[in-house]
Structures are given as C-alpha cells and as structure tokens.
C-alpha cells in the first residue's frame, strides 16, 4: 500500500511540474498530440525544463536529489541545459536525532558509547541524505588519543532506498517503452548504475577502503592530505577517520590573508587530479568545494585536504590511452585522428563514416582555438566530444563521463582561485610522461622484469624436463628427442642473441624515446 501511495505522489509531482509533457512530446501520433494538449491545459510551463526537473526532484526527497546529481554527471546522455540545472541540486537534509546516532553506534559495536570513545560530541557537524558526521576522541591500540570524525548512516535508509529504487526501475521501463528517446537515453541502464551507486554508499567500509587507497597513493605527493582510517572503529554503518582541520577552499580571501599562495594552490589542484588519473588510474570523483579544505598548520601549510570518498573513479590503461591521445590530437587539431580513436575504441557502430564523424568533431573543437590556450577548458572539450558522439550512437564508458565531470569541477575550482590558470600547461607533462612510458623503454623494461622470474625458473629446468620425459618413454619417441634437443639448441641461440643484441636494442629504444619527444608537437 505504501508503495502505491508513493507512486501516486511521484505521478502527481511529475504532472504538476509538467514532466509528463516532456515524455508525451516524443510521440507524433495525432491522438497523442491531442492528449498532450488536454493534460497540459491550465498549467504554467513557462519555466525551463531543466529547472522544472530540478524542482520536482527536490520535492520528491533526498533519494531523487541524489539521482539528479548522478544524472548531472551523464553529459553524454543529458541535454546540456538539463545537466547544468541538475548540477545545482544540493543534498540539504536536516540532521537526525543524535540519540539515534548513538544507538546505531552501540548496536554496531555491541558496546556502550563510553566503552568505544573517550569522548563523543552529540551535536552533528554535517548531515546529508545518507549519513551525518560527529566529532569524537578515541584511544588507539597503542593507547594514544586521537581526534576523529565519526560518520553514521541514517537508520532505515536501505528500506527507503529499496522502495524508491523499485519505483524508479518501473518508471524507467515505461519511459523506455513509450518515449521515442527512451532507448537513446537508456533509463534502465542509468537507474541500474544509480542502484549500484546508492547501495555502495550504504556500505561505509567501501568508502573507508577508497580513502585508504587514495591515502596510500598520495603518500609521496606533498600537496594533499587524506585522513587516516581507523579500521578498528569501522563497521558497515559507522566509519571513523582522522579529524582534519583547515579552511574551506571557497574562502579565498581568508586563505590569501593567511599567506597561502593562491595561484600555486590552483596549479596544485590540477597536479593532484592528473597524478591520480594518469599515474594511479584511481581518482577522487567528488572534488567540489564542499569536500576540500586547505591546511594552515605550519608543517602542512597550503596543502589540500580531501574529504568524503564515497565516489571514486577507476581507469584502465586503455582509458588513459584514449584520454591522452584525444587531448594531444585535439591540440594538434588532428580531428581525423580523434574520429579514428572513437572508432578504434569499438564504441561507434561499424557503419559510421570516419569523414562524417571527423566533420562533426571539427565543428565542435575548432571554435576553441579562437581563444588563448589558457582559456581552453579540457572538461568542456570532453563534454562537447561526448555530446557529438551521442549523435553517432557512441557508447561512452561511464568512468570517462565521471572523469569529465570531475575535470570540470577541478577546472572551475582552479579558475575560481586563479582566473589565469593555464590548465593545458599543467596537464601536458602528465600526458607527455604517460605517452613516453607507454612507448619508451620503461614499459618494455617493466614487462621484462615482470616475466623474468618465470623464465629464470623455466630455462634451468629444461634439461631435467627433457630427461624425465625421455626416461618415461624410452625407445618410443626418438623423433620427440630430436625435436626437444633441437628446441634446446634454438633456445640457447636465442639467449645468446638476446644478450649480444641487448646494447643495440637499448640504444634503439633511447632513440625511439627521443623521436617521441620530438613528435609531441
């Protein structure tokens, strides 16, 4: 019954904000046009469609707000005006009663609160639709007291989420059947991704693992601080991390008055992001100003502080190659190569003509070169490429769309700090190093080192293996003996050839690296 009532509520909100008109407008049958005219009679639909959708999602509650936030990252699927409006959605939810948070913690640990924490602040410092945060003090396994932040899941969230998701899945099926744009927008796929995303957020162990991975990756980079996870105090619905203190990055004047080098801070943000992308293939994908502070402590002055690790992105070597080659081809204005990269990726239907895709990409990219290099937005370039690709039914991978959205956030943040930030100059060394690593001797050397133990063990055992085989089948396999002995001779010759040619091969690889550097432009 409750699901039925919730469904009626959703339908009423959809009707009141004119969102049904967006679906019905896809139909061209005369009777559907008449139905649309009747249904929209007397309603004010003067607001832009994106604004109406945003306001409807806000009225439907936090789960739908989160859904809108996820949709805003799918610039490959959503029209630009709708994606831009959905990006304005804010996860504003009042905190739940602190006693409920205490009960959740005690239930998770099966202990009283004073047996878990040295002290616990009952007043939450932050709240969102999924969880809220309290400050506390713990005593670690060495007896050292630590200031921590405790994230506690809202109770009953799984039940609420499952009910709304069931309705979303049902609506997605209907939209895909009834709307002419349904198959292109892939509502069932989008809702399925959102389903996975929300259930991942319900497991705080996963978020803690993301934080631990980023902290480990960033240890050698003195530009960013990632809070330490205290695993002894983590459960699926409670996460305890190091308490971080700093100034929100949006408070630029306060940072400037404190002596922070603002232009350097802008460059450092880009450096952090591209290090995570091209070196680690694992990046913080929720780097908006609310999740970033700047340290003013003497030993870590001017460093970024990253918070909230519920959303991360992972990239394969193929994804990184796609990005690096697309960016370099774009700045060379080699639009044919950009089109070829899309086709080589296998995301484009086989019937796509390269010249047509090239012409469409040229129309998108060429206007960017009328402005200074420092004003070119790599995030916008990717977004426009994805939007152009949509016309050709290109299947863009979700992780690349997530990266594009994060890149836009990084660029916006960087240029808010320093309007003269040249993103390309900062990004270029990372692209160049990655390309050289892929084409130069470093990659070959890494692969040789990876395979060396296996071959080092196999080669000395070859005579023994031959002898064992022959003694088991004495007199029966003369031809096999000849073949194995011949193979051993060939192996010895091959090893000698590798050793004798090694120096020349290394020299050739060094020359190749120099050629790659010269061809960068």
Swiss-Prot record:
Transmembrane intervals: 496-516
Domain Protein kinase: 119-497
Compartment(s) where it occurs, according to its Swiss-Prot or TrEMBL record: Cell inner membrane
Positions that bind ATP: 125-133, 151
UniProt KW keywords: ATP-binding, Cell inner membrane, Cell membrane, Kinase, Membrane, Nucleotide-binding, Transferase, Transmembrane, Transmembrane helix, Ubiquinone biosynthesis
Top-level EC class as recorded in UniProt: transferase
One of the GO BP terms on file: ubiquinone biosynthetic process
Protein name (record): Probable protein kinase UbiB
Gene that encodes the chain: ubiB
């Amino acid at each position: 019954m409750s699901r039925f009532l919730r469904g009626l509520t959703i339908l009423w909100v959809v009707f009141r904000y004119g969102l049904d008109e967006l679906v019905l407008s896809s139909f061209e049958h005369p009777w559907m046009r008449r139905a649309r005219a009747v249904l929209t009679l007397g309603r004010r639909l003067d607001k832009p469609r994106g604004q109406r959708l945003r306001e409807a999602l806000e009225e439907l509650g936090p789960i739908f707000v989160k859904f809108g936030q996820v949709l805003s990252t799918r610039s490959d699927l959503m029209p630009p005006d709708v994606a831009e409006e959905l990006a304005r959605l804010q996860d504003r939810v009042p905190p739940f009663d602190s006693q409920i948070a205490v009960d959740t913690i005690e239930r998770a640990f099966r202990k009283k609160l004073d047996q878990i924490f040295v002290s616990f602040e009952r007043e939450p410092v932050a709240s969102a639709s999924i969880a809220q945060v309290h400050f506390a003090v713990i005593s670690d396994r060495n007896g050292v007291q630590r200031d921590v932040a405790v994230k506690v899941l809202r109770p009953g969230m799984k039940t609420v989420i499952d009910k709304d998701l069931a309705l979303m899945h049902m609506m997605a099926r209907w939209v895909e059947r009834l709307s002419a744009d349904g198959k292109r927008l892939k509502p069932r796929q989008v809702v399925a991704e959102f389903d996975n995303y929300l259930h991942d957020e319900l497991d705080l162990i996963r978020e803690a693992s993301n934080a631990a991975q980023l902290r480990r990756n960033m240890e050698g980079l003195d530009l960013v601080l990632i809070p330490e996870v205290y695993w002894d105090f983590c459960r699926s619905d409670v996460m305890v991390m190091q308490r971080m203190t700093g100034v929100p990055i949006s408070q630029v004047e306060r940072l400037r008055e404190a002596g922070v080098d603002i232009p350097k801070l802008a460059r450092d943000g880009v450096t952090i992001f591209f290090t995570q992308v091209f070196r680690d293939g694992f990046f913080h994908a929720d780097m908006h100003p609310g999740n970033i502070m700047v340290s003013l402590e003497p030993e870590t002055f001017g460093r970024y502080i990253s918070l909230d690790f519920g959303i991360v992105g992972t990239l394969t070597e193929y994804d990184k190659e796609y990005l690096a080659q697309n960016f370099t081809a774009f700045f060379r204005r080699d639009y044919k190569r950009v089109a070829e990269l899309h086709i080589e990726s296998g995301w484009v239907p086989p019937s796509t003509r390269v010249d047509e895709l090239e012409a469409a990409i040229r129309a998108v990219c060429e206007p960017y070169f009328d402005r200074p290099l420092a004003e070119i937005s790599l995030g916008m370039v990717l977004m426009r490429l994805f939007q152009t690709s949509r016309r050709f039914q290109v299947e863009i991978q979700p992780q690349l769309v997530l990266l594009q959205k994060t890149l836009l956030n990084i660029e916006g943040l960087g240029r808010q700090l320093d309007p003269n930030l040249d993103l390309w100059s900062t990004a270029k060394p990372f692209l160049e190093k990655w390309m050289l690593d892929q084409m130069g001797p470093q990659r070959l050397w890494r692969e040789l080192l990876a395979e060396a133990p296996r071959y080092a063990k196999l080669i000395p055992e070859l005579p023994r293996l031959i002898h064992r085989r022959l003694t088991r089948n004495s007199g029966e396999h003369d031809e096999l003996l000849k073949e194995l002995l011949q193979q051993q001779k060939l192996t010895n010759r091959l090893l000698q050839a590798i050793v004798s040619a090694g120096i020349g091969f290394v020299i050739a690889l060094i020359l190749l690296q120099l050629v790659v550097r010269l061809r960068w432009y």
